[in-house]
């Protein structure tokens, strides 16, 4: 009697079940370091796959862009509405050295500035710094009521808007083209350019809330490690905790321990 193939009996798979591998076991953490223009140099940590064959870990980290709040970089909550973009340029040991790569405003801050009864004036300009970076800077400003003004509205005329926009562009070009990127970032943090524009346009129409709201880097020069190290300075210095003196009345008193059954 011929015995046929029983299709109901399932065959066991070869090799059995595959062992689950934790993907993080093949990755390493690197410290992200901000340029010397900022107070807090430790931005955070980033993850990358370990060097395997031709795939080098440091190459996978280069040109990564990190977005950080200026409040964290300056330890000042008043700057929470600014977002700073930092691009990874080089890897030194476990440290990722970054360079300024742009700036933007948070959406809620921009929306809070726009109000009724005033004119919004915007200008943008392309500038080149002394160290070869080409940037596009966007400026925003709002008209305000003159002193002792009774009328509720403060709308500027078209001719005044054109004059203000021209003045904005002139000041942005003058401030950016006369310094390198590091010095320009130092001007962005305290909003020095915005105050300069506000002062210069006072005779045309009084302005308020004048900000460089956005900065985009269009073109960067060829990578130079020497210049990057100048920007970072001593990046190896780690944050050390501050020693706290314990008050005399808080000193711990050792109490005798009672041994049960002795």
Swiss-Prot record:
Location in or out of the cell: Cytoplasm
Organismal lineage: Eukaryota, Viridiplantae, Streptophyta, Embryophyta, Tracheophyta
Superkingdom, taxonomy of origin: Eukaryota
Gene this protein is translated from: RPS3AB
Record flagged with keyword Hydrolase: no
Protein's UniProt name: Small ribosomal subunit protein eS1y
GO molecular function (one): structural constituent of ribosome
GO biological processes: translation
Biased composition (Basic residues): 1-18
Region annotation (Disordered) ranges: 1-21
Quaternary state and interactors: Component of the small ribosomal subunit. Mature ribosomes consist of a small (40S) and a large (60S) subunit. The 40S subunit contains about 33 different proteins and 1 molecule of RNA (18S). The 60S subunit contains about 49 different proteins and 3 molecules of RNA (25S, 5.8S and 5S).
